[in-house]
Amino acid sequence: THGGFMDSHILRKAAARLPAVADLAVLRFNFRGVTSPRGASDGAFGDGIEERHDLAAAMEFVAQRSLPEPWLLGWSFGTEVVLKWGLEHPIAGAILLSPLLHRASAADLVAWAGSGIPLVAIIPEFDDYLRPAEARERFAVVPDVQLVAVDGAKHLWVGEKLTRRV
């Protein structure tokens, strides 16, 4: 992500816990130009446009392994990539954690409205970029979106209690 990476506390813990508790496979990856504790990815930040290819490569990996019913999860900048490019892939649903709605357009949102693909947006009460009231307004064009406002939470989901909620 731009500003985050696959080894963040939320994504690392989800990847460790979900296979055991929900029988799910988890694939984490960094977008181009991101440095994390596991190293640096190739390329440079593409402002949500070039990252389309990173998502496509990840989905190709999923398809090659015949993993059933893939869901996308994006956090912060990752939500922009999911909203803009996720519908190009055979997915079962998408989860948006702390969505920004800076790069995703109204047209991107409208595309999800007619897709029949479940969309869940998890909105922190005290988010720095998009709070629950504004999220309800902005996502109104997607009637089937499941908006989940989380009391007391902030954009980065700091603390074990909030990490577990996510």
State the predicted function of each range.
Residues 1-67:
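Serine-hydrolase catalytic machinery in alpha/beta-hydrolase-like enzymes
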Residues 69-74, 97:
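Short beta-strand immediately N-terminal to the catalytic nucleophile in serine-hydrolase-like folds
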Residues 73-82:
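Gly/Ala-rich beta-loop-alpha elbow adjacent to hydrolase catalytic centers
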Residues 96-104, 124-126:
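Active-site nucleophile loop of the alpha/beta-hydrolase fold
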Residues 115-116, 120-123, 127:
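Short beta-strand/loop motif that positions the catalytic acidic residue
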Residues 128-134:
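Conserved alpha/beta-hydrolase "acid-adjacent" motif
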Residues 129, 153-165:
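Catalytic histidine-centered segment of alpha/beta-hydrolase-like enzymes
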Residues 140-156:
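Catalytic histidine neighborhood in serine/cysteine hydrolases
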